[in-house]
């Protein structure tokens, strides 16, 4: 009848206990969340949960739990979190539907076609700009990207085509001391466009307008003099090598020309204005994760080796105790035998004294 007794339910995990459990799971996550299912990994997970339970129970202000309860609690937390994340993804898909996906696909397609032909232009502060944008341009935080060698043509049907960029002699305006001015406009052919991509993913284009550079744009302290007009070339792959040789692309000052309307928009850049994280950062993160994984495995190995050594020491101590007990029992047996033979010898000497053995035999001559 003892098996039919009603067991009391365990206490619910408090927020403090859940935080302690999550911290310990984060510590051993590379072992507990391993996707392997071989016998060695399963045994390692079992020992890891036992070690985690030992550390959990050693924390203050927590109830004593076994590793099965901790494992079940972690599985419930994980399942609940996955359910919430799936619900958020569904809600996000309802809000941002196929329109944003089409813009994303278009920008990714253009980026895959021309990955190495773009360089980035720094946005000038508002006080340095010589003209005011339209109302729509003031509301958008746009980043400008200019193409060097190729142009991308996107017609009304959405087809993408490329053609070589027609280069025009460029002007290099230098001060008397040989240093370039603070802002230089790179000359492009008439009808060249700049791509405006706002944060919402909308793509717009406007023509590049040029303005002559005056003496006031030279470096501070340089005397005002006539500027020499020469060819100034910005190589494709050396744009980022020397910052002193980079010309900052910027919009011109007030202009009377209005923006023309084209049947097919000429785009000279794509969504790659937001540069992806550098490969070095990705490799560093991977190395850090591998390092944490190796450290967790080494820590588990040290714990296992410590447990093995403790078990060996306990076994040796038990063997020593057993040997001592066996030796004590043997000594007791030997002492009993010694006492037995001593008592027997005493009885023999009493019955047959030693002096009687020295008497001559009666029949001796």
Curated annotation (Swiss-Prot):
UniProtKB keywords: Coiled coil
Source domain of life: Eukaryota
Pfam families (alphabetical): Myb_DNA-bind_5
InterPro entries from the UniProt entry: Myb_DNA-bind_5 (IPR028002)
Recorded coiled-coil stretches: 301-337
Myb-like domain span: 13-78
Entry's family note: Belongs to the MSANTD3 family.
PANTHER family: MYB_SANT-LIKE DNA-BINDING DOMAIN-CONTAINING PROTEIN 3, REGULATORY PROTEIN ZESTE
Protein name: Myb/SANT-like DNA-binding domain-containing protein 3
Gene name of this polypeptide: msantd3
């Amino acid at each position: 009848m003892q098996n039919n007794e009603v067991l009391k339910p365990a206490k619910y995990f408090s927020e403090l206990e859940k935080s302690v459990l999550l911290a310990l799971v984060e510590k051993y996550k590379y072992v507990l969340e391993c996707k392997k299912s071989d016998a060695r990994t399963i045994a390692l997970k079992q020992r890891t949960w036992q070690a985690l339970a030992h550390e959990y129970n050693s924390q203050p202000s927590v109830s004593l739990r076994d590793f099965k309860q901790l494992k079940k609690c972690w599985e419930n937390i994980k399942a609940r979190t996955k359910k919430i994340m799936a619900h958020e993804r569904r809600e996000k898909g309802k809000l941002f539907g196929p329109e944003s996906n089409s813009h994303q696909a278009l920008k990714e397609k253009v980026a895959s076609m021309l990955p190495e032909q773009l360089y980035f232009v720094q946005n000038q502060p508002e006080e340095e700009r010589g003209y005011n944008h339209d109302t729509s341009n003031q509301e958008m935080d746009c980043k400008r990207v200019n193409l060097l060698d190729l142009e991308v043509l996107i017609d009304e049907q959405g087809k993408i085509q490329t053609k070589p960029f027609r280069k025009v002699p460029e002007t290099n305006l230098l001060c008397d001391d040989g240093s370039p001015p603070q802002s230089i406009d790179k000359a492009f052919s008439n009808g060249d466009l700049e791509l405006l991509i706002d944060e919402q993913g909308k793509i717009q284009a406007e023509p590049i307008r040029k303005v002559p550079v005056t003496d006031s744009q030279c470096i501070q302290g340089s005397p005002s003099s006539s500027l020499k007009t020469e060819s100034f070339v910005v190589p494709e792959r050396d744009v980022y090598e020397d910052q002193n040789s980079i010309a900052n692309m910027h919009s011109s000052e007030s202009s009377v020309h209005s923006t023309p309307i084209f049947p097919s928009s000429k785009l000279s850049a794509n969504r790659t204005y937001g540069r992806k994280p550098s490969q070095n950062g990705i490799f560093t993160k991977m190395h850090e994760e591998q390092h944490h994984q190796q450290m967790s495995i080494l820590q588990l190995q040290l714990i296992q080796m410590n447990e093995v050594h403790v078990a060996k020491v306990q076994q040796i101590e038990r063997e020593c105790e057993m040997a001592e007990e066996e030796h004590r029992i043997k000594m007791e047996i030997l002492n009993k035998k010694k006492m037995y033979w001593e008592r027997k010898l005493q009885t023999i000497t009493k019955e047959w004294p030693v002096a009687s053995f020295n008497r001559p035999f009666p029949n001796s001559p």
